[in-house]
Design a protein with these regions (language model features):
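A cross-family kinase active-site recognition segment
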Residues: 2-3, 119-183, 202-204, 233
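Conserved short submotifs of the Hanks-type protein kinase catalytic core
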Residues: 106-118
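ATP/Mg2+ or Mg2+-diphosphate-binding catalytic cores
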Residues: 13, 255-256, 284-326
Length: 326
């Protein structure tokens, strides 16, 4: 493959319609909201879960965003975690307010305020990158030290991913298809780099831990919001922002200069930053050739391939990897 794949982030999920939710769930939501639901938009087709997610209009004039999932789906636990976490975030963290929750049968629903916004990074512009950077700086400051108790370490979240490059080298896992032709040559260095993770990917900051452009919203006033707070962990204060850099670089933003000037990263050792990017690249090398899980479209696997590609490209520049065979 000679170029990174294109991904349509407006079509990454296949979610149920409002009519597919059990009547008991819809009634429980109306009771929890204290208002009848008069209209529900078609479900959003972004994100990487198969849970219901759509804007709703209420008789009292409010607009809200409803997410609901049945027990057994990843989204069921994710929505519960978000409902637990968001009310504990400091006011400086700009996340949609949780309005209410509801349970019925084996379903859980969480309702948040509706933010009329757009996803940045399609592609990144300098203005949107500055907005996202500012949000990451403010959020990191507000969440250090973590105001939430009992969080797992970020390293624990990615512990198994650290093993992926070595597994590929050992023949225990296949190298995914359609990546840069030079990837096999740099796998030994990638495997070495991720071994720093136990000492690097720890810290006292509560991190979003899954910050991507599709987990950001820029509203009509230009304000940047952070959504989907179900992977919160303890880690270095810079990981959320650094996780945005490789795809932004791929789309024309000079992140190599930005990382030397930003207060989140200016004093962080190069190997620490590169280790984190290497771990995310390793994670993206898992399973991109398999069919997507239920509720996701094939765009999920192309997203993995795009992120593996761009994170490896970013490392290749930073570490002078041999991308041309001589």
């Amino acid at each position: 493959m000679s170029r990174a794949p294109d991904v349509d982030y407006s079509a990454t999920s296949a979610r149920p319609d409002w009519s597919a939710l059990p009547q008991a769930v819809r009634e429980a939501l109306a009771d929890a909201l204290g208002s009848r639901i008069t209209a529900v938009s078609p479900p959003v087709s972004t994100g990487f879960t198969g849970g219901f997610a759509a804007r709703a209009e209420l008789t009292d004039g409010r607009q809200v965003f409803i997410k609901a999932a049945q027990q057994g789906l990843h989204a069921y636990n994710a929505y519960q975690r978000e409902a637990e976490v968001v009310p504990q975030l400091p006011s400086a963290v700009r996340a949609p307010v949780i309005v209410t929750t509801a349970r019925a049968d084996d379903w859980f629903a969480v309702v948040s305020e509706w933010i009329d916004g757009r996803m940045p990074g399609t592609p990144w512009t300098a203005e949107d990158f500055e907005r996202a950077t500012a949000v990451c700086e403010v959020t990191a400051e507000a969440l250090r030290p973590s105001p939430l108790e009992g969080l797992d370490r970020f390293f624990d979240l990615v512990r198994d991913d650290v093993k992926v490059p070595a597994q590929i080298l050992a023949g225990e896992r296949q190298l995914p298809a359609r990546l840069q032709e030079w990837v096999p040559r740099v796998l030994p260095e990638l495997a070495d780099l991720v071994t720093l993770a136990p000492e690097v990917l720890v810290g006292d900051t509560a991190a979003h831990s899954d910050l991507r452009p599709d987990n950001l919203l820029i509203d009509n006033a230009g304000v940047c919001w952070t959504i989907d707070w179900n992977w919160l962990t303890l880690g270095p204060r810079w990981i959320d922002w650094v996780g945005l850099l490789p795809i932004a670089q791929h789309q024309g933003i000079d992140t190599f200069t930005a990382i030397t000037r930003n207060p989140l990263t200016a004093d962080v050792p190069k190997d620490h930053l590169d280790c984190f990017v290497a771990v995310i690249a390793a994670y993206m090398l898992k399973n991109p050739d398999l069919p997507p899980p239920p509720g996701c479209t094939p765009a999920l696997r192309e997203h993995q391939r795009l992120y593996a590609w761009t994170f490896l490209d970013w490392l290749a520049v930073r570490r002078n990897w041999p991308t041309v065979e001589v």
